[in-house]
């Protein structure tokens, strides 16, 4: 009889302990999940609605710490609107749609391709962290111009400058006989939507 009583007393304790362990595990999972999720008040609701998808593909490419920067890029590219929110249809990793502006008709695919391409830009620019501002400037401008811009930089100044961004655009306009080629102020245009103002302040200090 005494043994049964002890068993009855143990069961509620075991249930409470199991519930506490579950809550602890769930809280830890949520903490890990939200580690890089911080609401950016400078981007639109449409951009924020893609946060989980962006974080998913950022993690796949090991660039989750750049989530805020990716959101700023989407804000500049499309404001989070349309079917190609990362404007990545002309990117080399787009293998499902035509390589022409706004050809992608699947927002998730646009995000997948765009983030993969930006990861490549970061890698080629040898960016090691968010503190590597010159590398980030180079990676951002290359997302807009294409990797060809990095090859041009390697042959000229060896690093991003606002002037070589202008020069590359002018060169491409002549080479391709077009009136517009990319956005020479793309770095600034992205960073104005990035909450850490250090990068945009440094860009303005160096290149305004």
Could you tell me what each predicted segment is?
Residues 2-48, 53, 61, 98-112, ...:
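Non-catalytic cell-wall polysaccharide-engagement segments
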Residues 64:
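GGW-centered surface loops in extracellular recognition modules
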Residues 53-54, 68-100, 146:
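Cell-wall polysaccharide-cleaving catalytic domain and substrate-binding groove, primarily
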């Amino acid at each position: 009889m005494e043994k049964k009583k002890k068993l009855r007393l143990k069961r509620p304790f075991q249930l409470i302990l199991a519930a506490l362990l579950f809550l602890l595990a769930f809280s830890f999972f949520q903490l890990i999940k939200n580690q890089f999720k911080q609401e950016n008040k400078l981007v639109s609701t449409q951009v924020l609605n893609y946060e989980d998808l962006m974080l998913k593909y950022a993690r796949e490419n090991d660039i989750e710490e750049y989530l805020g920067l990716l959101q700023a890029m989407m804000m500049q590219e499309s404001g989070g609107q349309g079917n190609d929110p990362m404007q990545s249809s002309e990117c080399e990793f787009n293998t499902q749609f035509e390589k022409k502006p706004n050809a992608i008709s699947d927002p998730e695919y646009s995000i997948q391709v765009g983030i993969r391409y930006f990861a490549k830009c970061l890698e080629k620019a040898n960016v090691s962290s968010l503190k590597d501002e010159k590398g980030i400037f180079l990676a951002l401008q290359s997302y807009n111009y294409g990797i060809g811009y990095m090859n041009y930089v390697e042959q000229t100044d060896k690093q991003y400058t606002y002037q070589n961004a202008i020069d590359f655009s002018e060169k491409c306009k002549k080479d391709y006989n077009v009136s517009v080629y990319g956005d020479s102020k793309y770095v600034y245009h992205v960073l104005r939507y990035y909450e850490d103002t250090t990068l945009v302040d440094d860009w303005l200090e160096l290149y305004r």
